[in-house]
Amino acid sequence: GGPGTGKTTTINAMIHFFEEEGADILLAAPTGRAAKRMTEATGCEAQTIHRLLEVSGNPEDDDKRDKVGFGNGFGRNAENPLESDVIIIDEMSMVDIQLFQALLKAILPGTRLILVGDVDQLPSVGPGQVLRDLMNSRAFPMVTLEKIFRQAGQSDIVVNAHRINRGEQITLDNKSKDFFLLERNDVNVIYKHMIQLIQDMLPRYVGATSFDIQVLTPMRKGSLGCETLNEILQRYLNPADPHKKEHAYGNTVFREGDKVM
């Protein structure tokens, strides 16, 4: 299901049901951030799929483990499977085919595997479109959540995400105060307003620190590409300081205190 359709609520309901049945449950997601969100939303420990499968980067262990990409192996595999009655994977759209294969190898027959995700969200960085292909195959029981519930429906971000999926024009009435369009035609004005938003307006009205704010751009090069914007953001948010270490790499300066992704 898409944003605001109740995926997290459904996961919580399933956890409650299986706990009532006395089942052992494992929760996992493809990234650390997604696993952290899953833990916060459910109150149960979730971990990355790599951690669940006990990934190892030690070359000395490779002869004992299933190899999956770049010499890493997994301690959990067909010979040493996961012991659980139910495994719930969130953000399944980000799982690539190699990781999914490793997960399937480590699951015992009879284990319930529940995959949750939004096929229109972030795809996997690695090969394959596992969630989309599984859905298109119709080989497994599948439930699609379509209704946007009241709280999520009050967010213009959620509403516009669904409008875009339906091929409709986005709405800019901004009732929820979380979706803004500022039209600017001058590059220098864009720079100025970007810094104002990050240093003053968003911290004042939303309570976000500059470190909590992420600037996105569809380009790497050019006056509005990430290389130029990063240089400008660094100049204002993390200026040169004799007490901060820095390292130049080509035309880029990496400085202590920079935000790194």
Regions found by a protein language model. Give the residues of each.
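ASCE P-loop NTPase helicase motor core
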Residues: G2-K175
